[in-house]
Amino acid sequence: MARKQVSRKRRVKKNIENGVAHIRSTFNNTIVTITDEFGNALSWSSAGALGFRGSRKSTPFAAQMASETASKAAMEHGLKTVEVTVKGPGQGREAAIRALQSAGLEITAIKDVTPVPHNGCRPPKRRRV
């Protein structure tokens, strides 16, 4: 049976100079999404998408690699300055921010937007190893 020809949309190069880098760092993974000021995604990357699996996904090195690949893809759209929002308690927070800086993006502000409950849901029980 013949396969149908799938037409893929080519990425249109947008000329955006200012953006927002959303870094979500959990205990298991780090996801970096770079958007314009309105929240439209320009590029994204995560430790899992780069091939890190299991406990290696949560390392600072994996977060650094994810941040570098996302920033390189965003810089193709003309991105120069970025405002960073960090969410979550993971290990890759600082490493991801440093990688954005070393990739050549100018960081204008860093915000911590980690959601803090006003005593909402009961947290998971303590691990005993």
UniProtKB/Swiss-Prot annotation:
GO cellular component: ribonucleoprotein complex; ribosome
GO BP annotations listed: translation
Gene3D superfamilies referenced in this protein's UniProt entry, alphabetically: Ribosomal protein S11
InterPro entries: Ribosomal_uS11, Ribosomal_uS11_bac-type, Ribosomal_uS11_CS, Ribosomal_uS11_sf
Record-linked PROSITE patterns: RIBOSOMAL_S11 (PS00054)
Keywords: Ribonucleoprotein, Ribosomal protein, RNA-binding, rRNA-binding
Pfam family, one: Ribosomal_S11
MF GO annotations: rRNA binding; structural constituent of ribosome
Family stated for the protein in its record: Belongs to the universal ribosomal protein uS11 family.
Reported function: Located on the platform of the 30S subunit, it bridges several disparate RNA helices of the 16S rRNA. Forms part of the Shine-Dalgarno cleft in the 70S ribosome.
PANTHER family for this protein: 40S RIBOSOMAL PROTEIN S14/30S RIBOSOMAL PROTEIN S11
Quaternary structure and interacting proteins, as annotated: Part of the 30S ribosomal subunit. Interacts with proteins S7 and S18. Binds to IF-3.
Protein's name in the database: Small ribosomal subunit protein uS11
Organism listed in the record: Macrococcus caseolyticus (strain JCSC5402)
Gene: rpsK
